[in-house]
Amino acid sequence: MGKIIGIDLGTTNSCVAVLEGGEPTVIPNAEGNRTTPSVVAYTKKGERIVGEPAKRQAITNPDQTIRSIKRHMGTDHKVTLNDKEYTPQEISAMILQKLKRDAEEYLGEEVNEAVITVPAYFTDSQRQATKDAGRIAGLEVKRIINEPTAAALAYGLDKEGDKTILVFDLGGGTFDVSLLEIGDGVFEVVATSGNNHLGGDDFDKRIIDYLAENFKKEYGVDLRDDRMALQRLKDAAEKAKKELSSVKTTNINLPFITQTEDGPKHLDIDLTRAKFNELTEDLVEKTMGPTRQALKDAGLEPGDIDEVILVGGSTRIPAVQEAVKDFIGKAPHKGINPDEVVAMGAAIQAGVLAGDVDDIVLLDVTPLSLGIETLGGVFTKLIERNTTIPTSKKKVFTTAADNQTSVDIHVLQGERKLAKDNVTLGRFQLTGIPPAPRGVPQIEVKFDIDANGIVHVSAKDLGTGKKQQITIKSSSGLSEDEIEKMVNDARKHEEEDKKRLEEIEARNEADSLVYQTEKTLKESGDKVSKDVKDKVEKAKDELKKALEGDDVDQIKEKTEALKNELTELSSQLYAQAQQQAQQQAQGQQGAQTDNQTGQNDGKTIDVDYEEVDDDDK
């Protein structure tokens, strides 16, 4: 069986890991980095690029670059790239394909299965959309798990004793807080809360607005109206935010940011950490509400927490760390990388599913209450939030009118009292109920939540046994046919990418061979026969001509032909070199013999000597 990889599909960055020798290992991407920007773009030539290359060209190509698509998962939002509309699932699938490819390169084998993480506060439709994205990317999603839970898995893998931990997860676009009890290999989530629209992007936006307003006051130009200038502001804001985590002040310098009648204008502003804290104070405070709620739901006080784990790049912001420390009363744990820990936890869960890890039990919860709309537009809960999953609950309802032969089941998720204030997950109808006075028919509604947190609902007329059921689909409304089409499109793109890579490699090899051939011909002089040189020259010219066209097979064929001709040329060069070496060796041997002979040419050598008497001795 192939490896199951663990993927943290993030708003700003994504990460992939695998279990090796019982330990989670982060897989570096093709660019050599441990995280991959969640950015997709199309170049001016119509080539799709993902990750670091896409992020690098965003300033010069903002209209064809998509970031932070995770914020739109589970909605009917569409983006246009290269004159084509894409759903958030398709854009996410492109990021997943890149991670899949990098994992395959690292492992040296095909990867078809994955565990993907989502924010704990993701709704059913957002989870379903994530699963669809995996499928479009060619991955069977074995499990969807919550990001804070994954982080706890990575943290608690080698910990002894019972602990209560709080996972504070502030990513690029979402915020979650979860409370877990860890002990004897059991990871039990006791409460979770969060905000699906709060993250690092919001902190960046405060800096962007601050810079833009200052510039507008000085020059009367709003940089936010210019797509290219706005992209430069975004990059500068993100960089400044990161720098202010380690220094007290940073300089934001963007020369030639725009052009007015008076000439080019430059942006040059110093931003202090104190000013940044002032701009984002309310955002930091927004993280405290869900934190208090999670503690309240779990029936715990701040003093009951043994350890605080920070997850997500935005938790590097000093004001965030300070707020957590002040509220809980202890400094957060710093021994884990907040950008990688979620993917590592996903890899551990993948190991559990593959049977490679057998001493871990994960008990997760549903983040929001589930129920149906009843008479008067009331939201009637069947499953309360923070219920351990998988779970199943049923409740008997009845008709609201005489002789009612069908009932509409309106499935909802949320915490508000009225149905209209909660999130609609789906609707279906149970028909064929025998006419009867209101209150007589008995309709049993059953909710099942699987281990992925995905909801299945059924309604049954207890009188007739008639049953109707629904698996809640993403509210983006993707049908099975649409998903299948997207899978095929993604596969086609994958094949196109492989072909493009093959073409690049073939061209690079051919270019290199042409250069090497020209160099060899120049250096060989008259060491090889004219006939062989002419053949090599002809093969080289044919390859150069093939390189001017787009036929990859032709390039490969002409490359091989030139290689064959070069073999003959090389053979002659080696033979020539060998012959010269032998002649040189023979010449040296002859010279040595002459020297030895010359040392005794028959002449008498006179030697002076002195005779010594014995007495002088």
Swiss-Prot record:
Residues 575-617 are annotated as: Disordered. Residues 593-602 have a biased composition (Polar residues). Induction: By stress conditions e.g. heat shock. Keywords: ATP-binding, Chaperone, Nucleotide-binding, Phosphoprotein, Stress response. Residues 607-617 have a biased composition (Acidic residues). Residues 575-592 have a biased composition (Low complexity). The modification Phosphothreonine is found at residue 174. It holds the Pfam family HSP70. The keyword Phosphoprotein applies. One of its GO terms (molecular function) is unfolded protein binding. InterPro entries: ATPase_NBD, Chaperone_DnaK, Heat_shock_70_CS, HSP70_C_sf, HSP70_peptide-bd_sf, Hsp_70_fam. Belongs to the heat shock protein 70 family. NCBIfam families: PRK00290.1 (NF001413), prok_dnaK (TIGR02350). PANTHER family: HEAT SHOCK PROTEIN 70KDA. Acts as a chaperone. This is Chaperone protein DnaK.
